[in-house]
Swiss-Prot record:
Lipid bilayer topology: Peripheral membrane protein
Notes on the domains: The IMD domain consisting of an antiparallel dimer of three-helix bundles, featuring on one side a positively charged. The N-terminal alpha-helix inserts into the lipid bilayer. Also forms homodimers and homooligomers. The residue Trp-141 is essential for oligomer formation.
InterPro entries in UniProt: AH/BAR_dom_sf (IPR027267), Baiap2l2_I-BAR_dom (IPR030126), I-BAR_dom (IPR013606), IRSp53/IRTKS/Pinkbar (IPR027681), Pinkbar_SH3 (IPR035593), SH3-like_dom_sf (IPR036028), SH3_domain (IPR001452)
Keyword Phosphoprotein found: yes
SUPFAM superfamilies, A to Z: BAR/IMD domain-like, SH3-domain
Location of region: Disordered: 221-332, 399-529
Residue stretches spanning the membrane: none
Organism of origin: Bos taurus (Bovine)
Domain IMD: 1-239
GO molecular function: lipid binding
One GO BP annotation of this record: actin filament bundle assembly
Name by which UniProt lists this protein: BAR/IMD domain-containing adapter protein 2-like 2
């Protein structure tokens, strides 16, 4: 046998062996995996159906509410759309099962028998032809050896058998290669059909979702507007945390009205006896004071301002933006340093330099405040750096440099020096000139010792209240109350008409000057490496 024919034979047998031992087992495994994929998809489809039915029920509940009807409609539409897409996907899976898996499973069983028969037939035919050719060649060799006259005809017959054998092995190899290619083409064409079905499904899904998703997004963003929120919930931001018991934080209007003396400094409140019963001397002294002292304007205490300014809004657990909403007692006023325009954003607040804005949020959100322009109904966001806090303390018309603090008209007269502590004077003898009382030297010395140590104005609220002063004996209080009531009232009235001078003689006018830190930028500094 010629070596080339033997090579064709081995190549053809390798193709049949590859189809039987590699391709068909791989196709059987692919059918098994495809069936697992179908079972997983059916389980996924059932779970998706249950999930989107639950979403639809929640949307129907939102439709019955008074605040979330738009959101409920969005949820119902989303559920219907997803279930419709799920049904379309089931069509794709049916195509995958009917046009791919079933054909592969059926063709695999038939193909295994067909390839076995083809290989057996080729092997038998090849052996038969090879045997005939071998027999003819042996006869030709004997006839040539005997010099037979029929040797010429036998040689032609051997050449013909050899050509037929060569054509047979070539045709058999091409047939085997074609069968191998046909099987790979079958697998590729079936999955191409599946890919085309997926492409059609995703095209329909894109056309269905593209416009609806944009509409749902616009409606969802529109529901974030504070004007649409009828009650504090998911869409309405709440300013200030609730109390641990669940009730809302009371505002300044809901708080009980306090006495006028409670708006003074902590030291003056201790001295005026705000933690105990009011002595009879204090009541008599308050009756002797003029009417304009009783009708002093009531200013909010620094402690209430501090507590209201330290409120916190609730956490953004649902991605809510901080909205505007005026709290009862947490609003503060600021003055604009520069002008601010809203531009194309209608949520910003427009104001000019010098305008007063009422801040409606307890603290800045990323450097932005939300407030309302005083004297108008416009409100919006504005940068925190554009404004500065507005001093709400009243100014003494006789001396604009010294603010007037609230005084309790019902406080004892023997504690008059404590009322005057809101005036940050530079020396102690100026106050002694105003109220030179022989019986109150201890209180005044204690006060000026504390003033020299603190060097801070008394109208600034203190975090920790100072300890109460040691009460005077009852006999001393009664004597002081009976002897010095009228004189103290006269001195206080004359002091209000003619306030003390800003820098009395003998004091240091630069004692409270604070120097601003400077930076040395000269080149004489050493170069450190």
């Amino acid at each position: 046998m010629a070596p080339e024919m033997d090579q064709f034979y081995r190549s053809t047998m390798a193709i049949y062996k590859s189809i039987l031992e590699q391709f068909n087992p791989a196709l059987e495994n692919l059918v098994y995996l495809g069936n697992n994929y179908l079972r997983a998809f059916h389980a996924l489809s059932e779970a998706a159906e249950v999930y989107f039915n639950a979403i639809q029920k929640i949307g129907e509940q939102a439709l019955q509410s008074s605040t979330s009807q738009i959101l409920g409609e969005i949820l119902v539409q989303m559920s219907d759309t997803q279930r419709h897409l799920n049904s379309d996907l089931e069509v794709v899976v049916q195509t995958f099962h009917g046009d791919l898996l079933q054909h592969m499973e059926k063709n695999t069983k038939l193909d295994m028998q067909f390839i076995k028969d083809s290989r057996q037939h080729y092997e038998m035919e090849y052996r038969h032809r090879a045997a005939n050719l071998e027999k003819s060649m042996s006869q030709l060799w004997r006839m040539e050896r005997k010099r037979d006259k029929n040797a010429r005809e036998m040689k032609e017959s051997v050449n013909r058998l050899h050509a037929q054998m060569q054509a047979f092995v070539s045709e058999s190899q091409r047939a085997a290669e074609l069968e191998e290619k046909r099987r790979y083409r079958f697998l590729a064409e079936k999955h191409l059909l599946l890919s085309n079905t997926f492409l059609q499904f995703f095209g329909r899904a894109r056309g269905m979702l593209q416009n609806r998703v944009l509409l749902w997004k616009e409606q969802s963003e529109a529901s974030r507007s504070p004007s649409r929120a009828h009650s504090p919930g998911l869409l309405g931001p709440v300013l200030g945390p609730p109390y641990p018991s669940g009730r809302l934080t009371p505002t300044r209007l809901d708080m009980p009205q306090r006495a006028l003396g409670e708006f003074g400094s902590p030291r003056s409140r201790h001295g005026s006896g705000s933690y105990g019963p009011e002595p009879a001397e204090a009541r008599s002294a308050s009756q002797l004071e003029p009417d304009h002292r009783r009708s002093l304007p009531r200013t909010p205490s620094a402690s209430s301002l501090y507590s209201s300014s330290t409120q916190r809004s609730r956490s953004n657990s649902f991605g809510e933006r901080p909205g505007g909403g005026g709290g009862g007692g947490g609003a503060r006023r600021v003055r604009a340093l520069v002008s601010h325009s809203e531009g194309a954003n209608h949520t910003l607040l427009r104001f000019s330099a010098g305008d007063v804005v009422e801040v409606l949020v307890p603290e800045a959100q990323n450097g932005w405040l939300y407030g309302k322009l005083e004297g108008s109904s416009s409100s919006g966001w504005f940068p925190e750096a554009y404004v500065k806090p507005l001093d709400e303390l009243p100014v003494n018309p006789m001396n604009p440099l010294n603010p007037v603090t609230s005084m309790n008209p019902r406080s004892p007269v023997n504690e008059l020096p404590s009322r005057l502590r809101s005036y940050p004077l530079r020396g102690s003898h100026s106050l002694d000139d105003l109220l030179d009382r022989p019986g109150n030297s201890t209180a005044s010395s204690d006060y000026w010792d504390g003033q020299s140590r603190s060097r801070t104005p008394s109208h600034i609220p203190s975090r920790t209240p100072s300890p109460a002063p040691t009460p005077l004996p009852s006999s001393r209080r009664s004597s002081m109350g009976s002897m010095g009531v009228a004189s103290d009232v006269k001195k206080l009235a004359s002091w209000e008409q003619q306030p003390p001078e800003l820098f009395p003689r003998g004091t240091n006018p630069f004692a409270t000057v604070k120097l601003r830190p400077t930076v040395t930028n000269d080149r004489s500094a050493p170069l450190i490496r």
